[in-house]
């Protein structure tokens, strides 16, 4: 049991150390992230968070940037339905790092950004003295989602998540289907 706890602890520490990497802001600024997005894949070191109706099985609807902060409308599974919620991730002194209050405190990082095509972000979530790692792949055009899955897998590996911890979202997902 002690060996298992040590292994889990080391895996989490390695994942958290990856946050110190270089994350460059989009060349044209955060404003380029504004507009419609489609959630296509999630990953987490805690599968319950991204399973259907999990706390981080959320679907980005749209984003906008103002004063260096990111504002997002997301669809959240809630009581058997999907609720549209607006959240704001506040800029920090660190480039491409934001503070987000959602199911605890989150350090949100923009890992890879091509504002016209795809966005990969990850969050380090603190909730009730428990730390979790969650990654999210979004695309502008759903027909190109397969083009960006290898980049998502690579980012996940870099932050300590494994391929078997990735969930590719289907078109049948209820929140994805309830988009405007």
UniProtKB/Swiss-Prot annotation:
Similarity section: Belongs to the calycin superfamily. Lipocalin family.
Keyword annotations of the record: Allergen, Disulfide bond, Glycoprotein, Secreted, Signal, Transport
Signal peptide coordinates: 1-18
Ligase is among the record's keywords: no
Compartments where located: Secreted
Major location (coarse): secreted
Entries under PROSITE patterns matching the protein: LIPOCALIN (PS00213)
An example molecular function term from Gene Ontology annotations: odorant binding
Protein name per Swiss-Prot or TrEMBL: Minor allergen Can f 2
Disulfide bonds: 82-175
Transmembrane segment boundaries: none
Record's GO cellular component terms: extracellular space
Xref: CDD domains: lipocalin_Can_f_2
Classification of source organism: Eukaryota, Metazoa, Chordata, Craniata, Vertebrata
InterPro entries from the UniProt entry: Calycin (IPR012674), Lipocalin (IPR002345), Lipocalin_CS (IPR022272), Lipocln_cytosolic_FA-bd_dom (IPR000566), Maj_urinary (IPR002971)
Glycosylation positions in this chain: 45
SUPFAM superfamilies found in the cross-reference section: Lipocalins (SSF50814)
Distribution of this protein across tissues and organs: Tongue epithelial tissue and parotid gland.
